[in-house]
Amino acid sequence: MGQKIHPYGLRLGITSEWRSRWYADKQYADYLAEDIKIRDFLSKGLERAGIADVVIERTRDRVRVDIHTARPGIVIGRRGAEADRIRGKLEKLTGKQVQLNILEVKNVDASAQLVAQSIAEQLSNRVAFRRAMRKAIQGAMRQPQVKGIKVVCSGRLGGAEMGRTERYHEGRVPLHTLRAEIDYGTFEAHTTFGRIGVKVWIYKGDVVGGRRESLINARDDRGSRRGRNDRPRRGGGRRRRAAEQKQEG
């Protein structure tokens, strides 16, 4: 089941949090449709901005939209003109006051959505698909929090007459493990031969007690490097053996 289901939805409440945070009784369908329209508007209108995630939070009379982007300058615009335009469009769409928060994604190679978008952009620019996939994998595996990555491209790869699917992976990507933090992203590349779908899974370690395993291991490594008193002294084994031989003699 872990191979087929969306990794984010499978782990909701375990390792992943809700991207739409609100409560509604009779207006549930209206709010859900609004959220879909907001996400579609941002993904299509700000395709060049490299949007990794959109989090929507609602109160009674206000909507808060957090945009996680790799290029915040494109979203903000000159003197905030683009941000004001986006806010006006969203207020017209929702009919409520919109609070827009633009957050920068500093580690682009560790975000599955941004990696998938990068591969799709390269495919649209006629870069060989194997080269684009391997480059993305190498860039992701250089990041300390990334334990494994899996990339899948599907379509008329290289302009072939028949569509096919190519897969590359490196490291571990345990899709069945619920405590595993799996980041997932998809994007479509528009080429002269048709659309090519790109999917990326990135494994960032297990979440133990609300903390990521990779962060815990990094802290433990730092602590062991600082305090080296627990290391055995050189020559200790020889002295111990000599003392044992004396006692036997």
UniProtKB/Swiss-Prot annotation:
GO terms for biological process: translation. Residues 38-106 form the KH type-2 domain. SUPFAM superfamilies: Prokaryotic type KH domain (KH-domain type II), Ribosomal protein S3 C-terminal domain. The keyword rRNA-binding applies. Signal peptide: none annotated. InterPro entries: KH_dom (IPR004087), KH_dom-like_a/b (IPR015946), KH_dom_type_2 (IPR004044), KH_sf_prok-type (IPR009019), Ribosomal_S3_C_sf (IPR036419), Ribosomal_uS3_bac-typ (IPR005704), Ribosomal_uS3_C (IPR001351), Ribosomal_uS3_CS (IPR018280). PROSITE patterns: KH_TYPE_2, RIBOSOMAL_S3. GO terms for cellular component: cytosolic small ribosomal subunit. Pfam families: KH_2 (PF07650), Ribosomal_S3_C (PF00189). It comes from the Bacteria. The keyword Ribonucleoprotein applies. Residues 218-233 have a biased composition (Basic and acidic residues). GO terms for molecular function: mRNA binding; rRNA binding; structural constituent of ribosome. Keywords: Ribonucleoprotein, Ribosomal protein, RNA-binding, rRNA-binding. Residues 218-249 are annotated as: Disordered. NCBIfam families: rpsC_bact (TIGR01009). Part of the 30S ribosomal subunit. Forms a tight complex with proteins S10 and S14. Binds the lower part of the 30S subunit head. Binds mRNA in the 70S ribosome, positioning it for translation. HAMAP family: Ribosomal_uS3_B. Belongs to the universal ribosomal protein uS3 family. This is Small ribosomal subunit protein uS3. It comes from Corynebacterium kroppenstedtii (strain DSM 44385 / JCM 11950 / CIP 105744 / CCUG 35717).
